[in-house]
């Protein structure tokens, strides 16, 4: 049973499902909105080949699965897909079970947070934190916001989405 669960977790990571769930929760925390768990692009790394990796390396780039969320006016634009990023960036060197969060905002500028995103320790820590909050009566403020104060944003229309693509 544990082996099957581990295989499912790996599959979810490769397909981008795990990253999509994490960015949905982070968007809710950052923007004070309901969790957006559908209506956005989710593309994993299953179609990345060794040739893609080698070509990126020749260009001084790395391929990373990124989960991106941004607020544009009254819209939340959320997506998960492989990206080519310069090898010199800090997040290009995040590997294994380590996850990184890059926050770019005013007035703080760009900050990076990193830590384990999988395994017994991080999962246990998150569960204990949630249980502690509920035990002290703080169950109305999941993700730092009361359900009564959650903002309603529209989902971004990806038919309007423009970006560079590697073919």
Feature-to-residue mapping (PLM):
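Conserved active-site and cofactor/substrate-binding residues in soluble primary-metabolism enzymes
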Residues: 14-22, 43, 47-51, 98, ...
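Glycine-rich phosphate/pyrophosphate-binding beta-alpha loops
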Residues: 109-111, 115-121
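Single conserved hydrophobic/aromatic residue that forms the stacking wall/gate
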Residues: 1-10
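Flexible, glycine/charged-enriched surface loops at secondary-structure junctions
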Residues: 11-16, 34-42, 137-148
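Oxidoreductase and adenylate-handling cofactor-binding alpha/beta cores
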Residues: 21-35, 130
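Short beta-strand elements
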Residues: 27, 67-68, 82-84, 92-94, ...
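Active-site loops and adjacent core secondary-structure elements that bind or stabilize anionic groups
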Residues: 8-9, 45-63
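A conserved regulatory-domain signal marking ACT and ACT-like small-molecule sensing domains
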Residues: 126, 131-167
């Amino acid at each position: 049973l544990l082996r099957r669960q581990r295989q499912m977790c790996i599959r979810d990571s490769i397909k981008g499902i795990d990253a999509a769930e994490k960015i949905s929760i982070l968007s809710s925390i950052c923007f004070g909105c309901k969790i957006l768990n559908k209506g956005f692009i989710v593309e994993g790394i299953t179609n990345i080949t060794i040739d893609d990796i080698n070509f990126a390396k020749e260009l001084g780039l790395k391929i990373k699965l990124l989960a991106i969320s941004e607020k544009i006016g009254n819209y939340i634009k959320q997506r998960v897909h492989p990206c080519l990023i310069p090898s010199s960036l800090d997040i290009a060197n995040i590997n294994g079970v380590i996850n990184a969060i890059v926050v770019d905002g005013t007035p703080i500028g760009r900050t990076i947070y990193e830590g384990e995103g999988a395994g017994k320790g991080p999962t246990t820590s998150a569960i204990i934190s949630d249980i502690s909050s509920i035990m002290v009566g703080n169950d109305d403020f999941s993700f730092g916001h009361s359900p009564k104060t959650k903002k309603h944003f529209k989902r971004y229309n990806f038919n309007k989405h423009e970006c560079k693509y590697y073919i």
